[in-house]
Amino acid sequence: MIVDANLLLYAVDTESPFHARARDWLNSQLNGNQSVGLPWQSLGAFLRIVTRQGISEQPSTPAEAWKTIEDWLECDVAWVPTPTERHAEILGELVQRYQLRGNLIPDAQLAALAIEHGVEVCSADTDFARFTEIRWHNPLAED
């Protein structure tokens, strides 16, 4: 699996109504047996948002946010999926096929990574449903 930034953010944002479910899900995954992909794109978005003034009443310091990332990456099942030589071709196909613009481009980048590595995307973002080429799962959705 590849984890989108929104799940990482909800897992640490105690103000979010999704906090407990996201935290429990992420902890379960990071302590489980299945590989958990934490792309730099997701980690970078997490770092950008949790340290930003105005998003939260008490944003994380850069050191606190980086420590969280280090803790995740130290888990035995964590890995950082990187683009392969096919990334540009796959990303270009997705952008053109779905006529993507703006905020949908990062979703296409994660979808391309998922295709390259043959894994599912875990995200609370329903925009991933548009990509028929990938498996997408929202672990926060009501069963």
List PLM regions with ranges:
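Short, well-structured N-terminal submotif of metal-dependent ribonuclease cores
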Residues: 1-2, 6-38, 53-67, 143
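Active-site phosphate/pyrophosphate-handling residues
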Residues: 6-7, 44, 108-109
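Acidic active-site catalytic centers that drive phospho-/nucleotidyl reactions
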Residues: 4, 107, 125
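Active-site neighborhoods of divalent-metal-dependent phosphate/nucleic-acid chemistry enzymes
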Residues: 77-122
